[in-house]
Amino acid sequence: MKKTLILAFAVTILTTFNTKNLQAQTKDDAILAFNAAIELSKTDMTGAVVKMQDVVKMCTTIGKEADTLKMKANSVLPPWQYNIGNEFINAKKYPQAIAAYEKSRDMAIAYSDANIKEKAESMLAKLYVNDGNSLVNAQKYDEAISQFEKGLKYDPNYSKGYYANAMAYKKKGDNAKMKENMDLAIASATKENDTIIVKAAKNMIGSSLNQEGIAAYNKKAYTEAVTKLNAALGYDFKTKDLYYVLASSNNSLKKYDEAIEAAKSGLEMEVQTNDKTARYYCEIAKAYEGKNDIGNACANYRKAAYGAFAQFSNDKIKNVLKCQ
């Protein structure tokens, strides 16, 4: 009983002492602690952040007299915490870097530091996207998409993030989501004047639409084929084969002027030998025949009468149109 009373008395004395010591803290004490934290930041940024947070607590306890010092202490916390993230990046400790940048962003919001907030968000976007790319390489597409979308929440204008996300959806076979994200990549990259991403994204969408258009053509779904192929052209995706299929599809739909235009565009891209150009002249001839322009039809069937198109074209010339 006696020992218990002695222990209780000792605790009371310590508590009273600590309370008085806390109350006895002055602005000068806070200044000394502030300067010590500044000095520590030269060698130990993580420790310096902890010490500066203690300075903020001291200033809060001291009150209005220490408000200016408290403001100074608060102002260094976001950039210091951001620098901790940089240290982790240099050490290639990326998960720790993410945690540090997220903390610096929170501090930047709390202390109204727009510059550090923007810088932290930019780094977080890059780190999450890099992590997502690693997951794509490991064929973990759903996990990758989750990381990409985390990164894009931090930087909604990060074109490389949208492009990477689109590629993950493509790997999954989700062309609709691929196109959606590629369009966002194009919009963001255009603002950033990133012509490499713009070109790559347009090529990816155009290539996909071209494949869909050719698949529709092979199923004789000519309206769908024309829609898909024209959409591909809208993304600056142009190939001689696309123009040939587009010309043939338009002829099947009796859109003769469009067929002639597409065939001529393909013809310009083709190697200029009779065997190579024959298929385009054949489509042009069909279109003129459909328009009942026999003179132009005959002229173009003659140009088409080579290789695989020779028999068909000669039959048109001799037996169908009876060209002179």
Report each predicted region and the residues it spans.
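N-terminal leader/linker segments that initiate helical-solenoid repeat arrays
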Residues: 2, 21-83, 90-91, 110-111
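Residue-level recognition of tetratricopeptide repeat
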Residues: 29, 62, 111, 158, ...
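TPR alpha-solenoid repeat register
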Residues: 65-66, 80, 113-114, 120, ...
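Canonical tetratricopeptide repeat
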Residues: 69, 76, 83, 116, ...
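Register position in tetratricopeptide repeats
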Residues: 83, 90, 130, 137-138, ...
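Terminal, low-structured helical/coil segments at or just beyond the last alpha-helical repeat
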Residues: 196-207, 211-223, 275, 282-286, ...
